Amino acid sequence: MKQQPKVSVLISFYNLAPYVDQTMQSVLAQKTDFPVEVLCADDGSDDGTIEILRAWEQKYPDTVRVFVMDRTPGANYEANERIRRMNAIRGRLFYEARGEYVCYLDGDDFYTDDRKLQKQAAVLDADTAHRYVACGHNGCYYWQSTGKTQPIEKPLRACSLTAKEYWSFLYVHTNAMMFRNVGRQGIDPYASGVQIIDNMLTFQFLPYGGVYYLPDCMFHYRQIEGSTYHRRSVYQNYILNALMLYQQKVICKGFFASGLVRTLFEYSQLFAARKDPRLTAQAQTYLGNIRTYHAGRLRRIVNYNNENVLARLWCEVENPVWFFITKVCRHFIWKPKVRALLEEARQKQEQTA
């Protein structure tokens, strides 16, 4: 008889055959005092990924389950369709998860601490008041070509943050998060229909609690030349991050001020680059391929050279006012609060040392 798992690890794959074994081994090697299930979803790979996953499923039939999406042979889906399929994969895994806690993992990344799941579950178990919906930690970039590593975020002491404080300042890669399985309480974090990419996955859970942060680097985020992330320019990544400000309103309007603070840097860079014809053209082309309502608004913001005088005047007025307000909020409201929280965490550490 299968035991009820405490943690469900949800892994998504597409044409990642060279990395499957390392990823699966890092998860199955976890040392815990509770049962763990590993759910794998593949987006119709044609490079042998599915066969490798089936072998792991046969080897660990009580732990590993594999789901495969249908895919038209040779199909080359556009960006929106690829994101939709990724949403479907992650949603399917979430609905299948039986654990009290869930962790997401990309199929080419891997855990580096065999106590990772135990450490995070211990934090959430101790939080009997359910103040935290997630426990996150630091990770390391891992360059496939050289084997070099580098922490994703600057070292930070262990601390607890409310949902708004987290969304204003902190970034934790989704692979480093352990979430409470809110689906067991009948809550569907995917019901909003928002595209679930990177940070937006974490944001789906934030309305249900804060985040406890551990400073340990416990996973490697593989950097592969030619990947989707590396094919995008820095400017295009600014645009995608800025679009999250509007997407998050669909989930919870109460986080909009935090979102303004979070995306301040991206908007300041977009605003500063508007007078560069090359960057403006790049932005318009890139945004033209993003079929969302909010992409239209962002197109107006970055299009400084619009022939419409009123549109240019609106850009000149709207952006500086918005920039000033968010900078004031960041400096006088959020930064002091976070400093106080970090100082409180430091004092507690000194008292327990």
Which sequence ranges carry the predicted segments?
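Catalytic core of nucleotide-sugar-dependent glycosyltransferases
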Residues: 165, 221-225, 230-257, 279-293
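A conserved acidic beta->alpha catalytic loop
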Residues: 42-51, 71-74, 106
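Short aromatic/hydrophobic "clamp" motif used to bind/position activated sugar donors
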Residues: 102
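Conserved nucleotide-sugar donor-binding catalytic segment
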Residues: 95, 137-138, 155-236
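Conserved donor NDP-sugar-binding/catalytic core segment of glycosyltransferases
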Residues: 110, 115-150
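Short, well-formed alpha-helical segments that are part of the catalytic scaffolds
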Residues: 16-29
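Membrane-interface aromatic/basic loop that binds lipid-linked glycans or pyrophosphate carriers
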Residues: 33, 272-353
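Glycine-rich, basic loop-to-helix element that forms the pyrophosphate-binding segment
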Residues: 70-97
